[in-house]
């Protein structure tokens, strides 16, 4: 659980930048990539990640502009990436102007359970990270280069003068 807005905002800045890098790497064609016809496509997961910022925080008193629905899925990768950038920035501005550290202790109902806003913010980051992991697998299957997040991606080791780990 986050105890201060500053701590959350520093974490969000890194995580949002990482998510933005992934979304910026998508192509319109890659949005159709799927594991099976019974699972979400890369585009569906990407758009859900955008909309989740507003959906997850909808039971709080925060007000900001963000997509409120994660379906239907846009067909433009650029639109998805731009929408994430806008939603994330609006979310950060709302936090800075509408909440205080004290607000993080206030409890809300989220998916049938009571939790402090600080825990909800942790859930938001973890939820986003979960879907980023799914996206990286689908991106590889779609033939895209995956940017490194918590370390270099396979294609990035050479930038550091190192050989990529053996397969």
Curated annotation (Swiss-Prot):
Q: Native species of this protein? A: Bacillus subtilis (strain 168)
Q: Which domain of life is it from?
A: Bacteria
Cross-referenced InterPro entries, in alphabetical order? DinB, DinB/YfiT-like
The coding gene here is yrdA
Keyword Disulfide bond carried by entry: no
Q: Which family does it belong to?
A: Belongs to the DinB family.
**For this protein, what is any one GO molecular function term?**
metal ion binding
Keyword Cell division in annotation = no
Query: Which keywords are on file for this protein?
Result: Metal-binding
Q: What is the recorded name of this protein? A: Uncharacterized protein YrdA
Q: Where does a divalent metal cation bind?
A: 48, 127, 131
Gene3D superfamilies membership: dinb family like domain
């Amino acid at each position: 659980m986050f105890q201060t807005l500053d701590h959350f905002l520093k974490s969000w800045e890194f995580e949002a930048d990482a998510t933005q890098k992934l979304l910026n790497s998508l192509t319109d064609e890659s949005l159709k990539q799927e594991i099976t016809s019974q699972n979400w496509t890369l585009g569906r997961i990407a758009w859900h990640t955008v909309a989740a910022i507003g959906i997850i925080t909808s039971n709080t008193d925060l007000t900001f502009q963000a997509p409120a629905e994660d379906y239907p899925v846009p067909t433009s990768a650029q639109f998805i990436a731009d929408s994430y950038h806008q939603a994330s920035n609006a979310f950060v501005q709302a936090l800075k102007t509408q909440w205080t550290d004290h607000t993080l202790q206030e409890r809300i109902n989220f998916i049938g359970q009571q939790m402090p806003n600080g825990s909800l913010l942790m859930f938001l980051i973890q939820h986003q990270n979960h879907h980023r992991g799914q996206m990286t697998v689908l991106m590889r299957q779609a033939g895209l280069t995956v940017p490194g997040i918590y370390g270099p991606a396979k294609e990035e080791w050479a930038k550091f003068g190192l050989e990529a780990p053996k397969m």
